[in-house]
Amino acid sequence: MNNVQISVLDEVVSDSKNIRQVKALYRALKTKDQQLIQKILVDEPVWDVSPGFPEGEIYRGMSEVFGGFYQKLLARVHTFGAFPDRFIDGGDTVVALGQYQITKTNSGLPVLVRFSHAWGIDDTGRIKGVWQVADSAQFFAS
């Protein structure tokens, strides 16, 4: 028997075009594929990170998102990853529900932090940005 592991980020026949695009962005972010990220996102994406979450504020443009938000967030942790497990298609908005997996130190145990991401999609299929809400208490408790 063939043991094939299927990831929630793999495309399935029932996925809409917009869900496929959001899944492609999560895969590109995970592999740090800058060319693909720039192809998927609009030129000036907006990351609206919930107040109370580390570095929570609104980031506009690639340099603020990747040179500001992610750089500051990653300086606080040893590892960080977003693992969506459900996608909901709302037309020009795709909601992803999942968990961040965070370790704060080299020897620390991973902590799971629930999140909801609402991704805006423009008329050309490019992602405009994200509205993020997460369980900040879990992040700070770790």
Residue ranges of each PLM-predicted region?
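Short, low-complexity N-terminal intrinsically disordered segments enriched in polar/charged residues
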Residues: M1-D43
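Hydrophobic alpha-helical elements and their junctions with loops/disorder across both membrane
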Residues: L29, Q35, G52, T103-T105
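A beta-strand edge to alpha-helix "cap/lid" segment located at domain peripheries
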Residues: M1-K17, G67-S142
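A solvent-exposed, acidic/Ser-Thr-rich amphipathic alpha-helical stretch
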Residues: Q34-D92
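A generic helix-loop boundary/linker signal
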Residues: V12-D15, R27, E55, Y59, ...
